[in-house]
């Protein structure tokens, strides 16, 4: 598994503005073509330029795996049609009061963790849309579980203060070992600084050498 360091909009928070699965990288409109080409090379996926709810917060607002995409109810009809047309994914708009879905939900192709604040019916919709088993659980005392972890089919990292039993249970659900780690020089909210798929991991530009070593171990599978 290759690990790369990269920045977006002159900052290390690549996971806020981008999102990816094994086939597509979703980037904000106006994103520099040269930078997009490098991400395509790193991740072996096609870049698509779009928006969510007329913002560039791709990672914060959307949730996806290789089966589907969950979008907030604030997405526009034009945006919805774009995702339907340019992907072969199951595109589902979640009718919920929460909009920052990427901060509240974390998934891979095997499982997912959903914030306890979602009602049971919405959790069922999420699981069915993405074709996975999900559990509801706080991580390190936070309801914003999507901000606390990142997992692919090859591994994952999670907030370093996560309880050992929670790490074990989440690893079981995701089908990969979850490694407690930080990103971007000590940031525990790991999804803000990470973009990953089965081929590679792209970390924020402030990520330290020891953190790179942890990422290498975490995503070795």
From Swiss-Prot:
GO terms for biological process: cytosolic ribosome assembly. It comes from the Archaea. Binds to the 50S ribosomal subunit and prevents its association with the 30S ribosomal subunit to form the 70S initiation complex. Transmembrane segments: none annotated. One of its GO terms (molecular function) is ribosome binding. It comes from Cenarchaeum symbiosum (strain A). The gene is eif6. The keyword Protein biosynthesis applies. This is Translation initiation factor 6. Signal peptide: none annotated. Keywords: Initiation factor, Protein biosynthesis. Belongs to the eIF-6 family.
